[in-house]
Structure formats: structure tokens, C-alpha cells
Amino acid sequence: SDIRIIRKILDTLTEFNEQGVPVKGTWDTENFFSLQKILPEYAPDIIDKMKERVIKYGDENIIMGYNNGALSAMTEDEFCESINLAITNPDGSGLEDIFGTCEKIVRPQEVMFTPSQVSLYNKLGIKALCLYYSCVPFDAFRTIIPKLSDEEAFNPLTYTYNGESMTIIPTYSNSDVCDAGCLRAW
């Protein structure tokens, strides 16, 4: 199950840290289902370990959106509410509520992106988006920009739409490994 996998990842990261390897996690967890409902009931130890790792090893929490909704399909009000509630909310399941801090970086649900929302991300103080520059066509940033060089494809870049810019952090998925044939070839 996902809970066992997350526990194993947390334990593995901590084992490496204890061996002197400076690894840290970047977590993108939606709030309503995972941080407010499921984990507190079935795996509160995961939240405790994540909190500990934020303090002790510098793990980061980035925004996904409050309720796992498709940010790219939301109205302006829904979009703003989802981002704001993901940061802090009356139920205490915001990233700042739980972890005391969060990075103003968004990895939207299914990494879906709508260029017209760049202005909304900027309005909310979001510093960057993590988007697949990937071979997955339904949610790939790659489909709306010119091909990037290898250097550009593995480093943050600036995306501009209608005069507004923001930083995009290209990310990848297991489908990219499959597209290359194997991890070594990728």
C-alpha cells in the first residue's frame, strides 16, 4: 500500500542521513484527504516523521492543492481558495499549520497546467511550478513550448505568458525512463 511505501521512503532517507549522506525529501501532499483525513487516522506516524525530517534534515513541503482537484480546471476563486487552504486552513491541515513552513512552489494535481493561470500563481506569491517536461502528453509542459536543450530540460527556466513570467522546474516520471528504454539510457 501507499502507506507502507511512504514509511519505507522516510526510513530510507533517514538511514542515508544517519550515514552522512545529505539527502532530503520534497513532499507534495494534498491536504484534505491525506493530511486531514487518512494519515491522522491510519498513519499518524508518517506525519510525525515528515515533521521531524523538516526540522532535522531540511525536507521541504510544496503545495499540491487543498483537495486534489484539478487546479487547471478551476475558476479563479476556486483556484485561489485551493492554494490558500493548502497553505493554512481552519481545520489545521495546511502545510504551514502542520509543518510550520512550506515552499511557495506548486506541483499541481496530475501536473496539469493552464498558461492563463500564470497571473494567478504570481498573485498568490507562488515562486515556481514543478511541471513534467515529459513524454506523458496529457499533462506535459513539453507539449506547449519549443523543445529544450538537455541543459534547459534539467534546470529551472522562466516561462512567460501574456507578459507574466514564472519559474518552471522541469520534472520527470517513470514514463520517461520507459521512453528511453531503461534508466541507464535515460
Feature roles, as predicted:
Residues 37, 59-77:
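Substrate-binding cleft and catalytic face of glycoside hydrolase catalytic domains
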Residues 64, 106, 169:
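Conserved, mostly hydrophobic/aromatic
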Residues 69-95, 161-186:
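Alpha-helical scaffold elements lining the catalytic groove of polysaccharide deacetylases
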Residues 77-123:
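A conserved hydrophobic secondary-structure block that centers on an alpha-helix together
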Residues 110-186:
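Active-site-adjacent pocket scaffolds in enzyme catalytic domains
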Residues 1-56, 114, 129, 134:
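Active-site beta->alpha N-cap acidic-glycine motif
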Residues 32-34, 67-72, 135, 176:
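A short, flexible beta-alpha/helix-coil linker loop
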Residues 19-25, 57-60, 100-103, 124-127, ...:
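Loop/turn elements at helix/coil->beta-strand transitions in domains of secreted/extracellular proteins
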